[in-house]
Amino acid sequence: MSLQSKHFIQALKNGVVPATGCTEPIAVAFGAATCMAQLTNREIQAIEVHVSPNVMKNALAVMVPGTGEPGLLVAAAAGAIAGDATVGLSVIEGLRATDLPTILDLAHSGKVTAKTALVPDDLYVEVTIKDLENTVTVAIAGSHTNIFSLKKDDQILIDHPRPAAHASSESKQFLQTMNFKAVWDFAMNEPLEHLRFMKEAHTLNLALAQDGFTHDYGLQLGQSINGAKRNHFGSGTENDLGNRMIAYAAAASDARMGGAQLPAMSNSGSGNQGITATIPVSVAADAVQATEEQLIRAQALSHLTALYIHSFLPVLSAFCATDSAAMGAAAGVVYLYDGTYEDACHAIQNMAGDAAGMICDGAGCACAMKVATAVSSMYRGVNLALQGIVIPNSNGIVCPTIDETIHGIGRLGTEGLRETDPVILDIMLNK
């Protein structure tokens, strides 16, 4: 195996992982569970949570899995009472119904507080838990489970260098040196046994979609797209591939944002990005009766493309990255429909000229709408590309080459929307 292939596979294994619940409140639950693992008395006297503005934005409205309630107070209480920090972003996957009264009592007792930290980090979480005997503080930055500091009273348990406020991981730094052609060639040519693990994304996220169709989560957007035919307002999903892609992706997001206890396979630290990169590819694979190898290669191409594009974006920002995740899906769907590398480039260029720049105004049930928007853009972009049509580079942020366009999208998210984030949070906190 070449060194480049090893780096690509490591990027997939680092960036495509299961997560139960929206990853920002789950990072707080992970922090609380980490603290509790160091306490022996465990009679909680206080839990203090401090998070960066982007984490606060993404935790205000989204449901904490298994609790039926949103917010950081509930997330911290859930992690403290029912969390297992050893399983990372699946920290509260084992939460039981019998835990719920204790969790909600703690969350609403006044013992748990959450505030915005005055830090420049895109992603920062600090949790302090006091019991009758000890005080433990954990600090996380850079990624959702990256602990750089852990203290118990005056004892330092973990003391790593704090990541720079906008630092990129090793995987992101590697991806930034690559190009889309290298991503495409890897997904097409890497021995299948090296990629087989990517099938889990298909399995997990389709199960989440089915849960969204079965239960009334959030906006019930996925259900409503199929149900539109009852009102003579649409064709439903049975005979409409585009609608089916949108409905399945929206249903999975409905479930995730609505508090389902099933894990999503995430991408770039986001379940909704993972859903967006996965579901359209899975639906397309079913439509063309793809082989297992074609499905796996398409998922690997989709997720690695999404990771490549996201490597130029902040881990959290005002840029809704379901759109960049859907660009990954576009590549995977083009491959399944016997398209070429050039067709995939054209599909992504078409998307860049469409909905790139959709804002992230925090996690919540409306994320399903944004997932649907991104997948709809993907369908239009691929449809044009497969018919030989591409938006000319005289238009907007569409550049002469695919990699220039991707770098431009990175600039849009990193520089262009920098001042947008605090305005969004101010509106959210003062309405």
Curated annotation (Swiss-Prot):
InterPro entries: Ser_deHydtase-like_asu (IPR005130), UPF0597 (IPR021144). One of its GO terms (biological process) is L-cysteine catabolic process to pyruvate. GO terms for molecular function: L-cysteine desulfhydrase activity. It comes from the Bacteria. It holds the Pfam family SDH_alpha. Belongs to the UPF0597 family. HAMAP family: UPF0597. This is UPF0597 protein LCA_0156. It comes from Latilactobacillus sakei subsp. sakei (strain 23K) (Lactobacillus sakei subsp. sakei).
